[in-house]
Amino acid sequence: MKDYIEKIKAIGYSKIIEESDDHVIAKGGEILVHIIRTDEKELTPRLVNTIVTKLLVLDPVPNYAWITNGEANSYQDVMFAKAIPEIPAPLTREEEKLFGRKEITKRDKWSYLMYEKLQTRFDQLHQLIYDSRDSVDNTNDAIDEFCKLIFMEEFRINHPDYKLKKGVLAGKKIKDLLWHERFEKDDADKKAIVEEIRTAFKEIKDHPDYVAHLDDGTEAPIFDPDSYLKLGKVEIYYKVLKALQDLGDISTNGTTRQATLNDLSGDVLGRVFDVLIRGKFENKGGMGIYLTPRQVTEAAVDMVMHDLKKSPGKITKLDIHNRPEFKVLDGCCGSGGFLIKMLEELKQYLLIELAGDRKQWEERFEKMKEHSIVGADNSPGMILKARINMALHGANRAQIFKTENSLTSPQLKPETFDVILTNPPFKSGGISEKSSEGKTTLQFFRNDIEDGVNQKRSTGLSLGSKPDGKGKWKPVSSMDPAILFIDRYLQLLKPGGLCMMVVPDGVLSNSGDRYVREYLMGKKNEITGEFEGGKAILKGVISLPQETFSLSGAGAKTSLLYFKKKEHPGEKQGSVFMAVADEVGFTVKNKIEVQLGDDHNSLLKIIDSYKRGH
């Protein structure tokens, strides 16, 4: 570890408190850094999360962690479990006073100690379900069935006195019905117990506490009306329930009792589930179903939150019904990666903004979980994963719902959203008039064209057409959905709202798509040098490397496109932040994602550069 000691001293951490073959503790002022060396070949998210979680149990909790395997490195802000581009120099004494420290309670420490155990259990349970081939065909099906059983356990904990109301189970308490020890009795009819659990699921899956209420009054339950527990094997039910319920004892207020998942503090359970999804999800690019890499979602949210903090009232403002006005959307939300990250950042922001008033923070954040986070997707399986993911982060009724088409859904209202974070599907000619649905969609995107003239109204849609050589807008027979989503998101944003989206590079560079760029930011006046006539202010473009979405099968080179909807037509285009990410922290070999570490993630330094310049 001598090389690492020399490097950390060079940064300014001159005091070495402890040193071993795989662990060094260094101090600069009052700031602590732990350098941890692992023999693992890859610094996977699970490994990094496990190490950081263990550090959170220490007293004192270190400020930063430098995790390495000798080749790859990960740098972490321990308190916020967040990747940073490098270990910063120690703070000055004045800065130390402002730094602040997060209070770590006994409950927090117990939760952090449980993190690795639960991560191992979740992996084993997923594998058990997948290997059983019990009405599951692939790893994603196994995740879905596991989601249903997690939901059942969450319901049991939160509604212990709930009595079933239908059929032969009427009058039975859910807490007794779902208790794993029922399977351990010698005289137990184990198959009958399984059938009781499956029957109970049909009744409780639409319980009001897990039904989101959309702004148009529509109700959105977690599960489809036809959803049922597919699993039938006794072994699976017993092992899953035991793993979720047998968490040992916990002491609270001087009393020792059996712990439950609800005793886990913060987002520990949600983080466990999120790592499971990212580790086990099978990308199906041909179906347009794949996960946005964690490194991309974190960078996008970090950049947007930096700008939002300049207008703090926007996040905390309440409407006449005392509900948050602030709204975030992902119209192609998948498993909810962007929305989960945004929820975590909003939580931290409110903790700081409302410091000292715990009750107000809890009330405000509860309302934000129900009213500020909106997601839509056309895949029932992805909506299930997103809703369970949100529920495990404490947002049981987040407004995430299934829609046939986010491009045209009436449930998404114009000028409703402050922020949009999204990775829409893209395919040249992907929406075509050859299908009736495609024809209807393209017609929907021509409502702002009158006699060949683009009216460019704030809520108008135009990109179901394109201008000819004389500037007259005419209908097109097909269009890349990514282009239509640019138009749709401009419509859905409030004036001044921010959108960060993944787009294929062709939209930004192809000569044939120039009209899209001009629609977005306007044409350049060669005399004044100003861009005129656009609907948005382009804030930034970050080019992503080819391998970013190679597992999806899309194969297209992509970029992050960041823009603000104009607050008024005369708003001027300023300078545009441009960057190229050569690496995003992983590569793909033989269709497998290989983690390279944070020092191979250009996005961390790019976002840091954006923050310093803006």
Where are these regions (language model features)?
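Acidic-basic catalytic patches of nuclease active cores, encompassing PD-(D/E)XK
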Residues: 1-20, 27, 488, 524
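Active-site beta-strand-loop-beta-strand hairpin of nuclease catalytic cores
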Residues: 22-34, 82
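Nucleic-acid nuclease catalytic cores
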Residues: 41-86
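A conserved structural/catalytic subdomain of Rossmann-like adenosyl-cofactor enzymes
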Residues: 45, 414, 418-614
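Domain-level recognition of nuclease-like catalytic cores that cleave nucleotide substrates
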Residues: 70-108
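Non-catalytic accessory regions of SAM-dependent methyltransferases
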Residues: 98-164
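Long recognition/docking surfaces used for binding and targeting
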Residues: 151, 158-281
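Conserved S-adenosyl-L-methionine
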Residues: 293-422, 427-439, 503-506, 516-517, ...
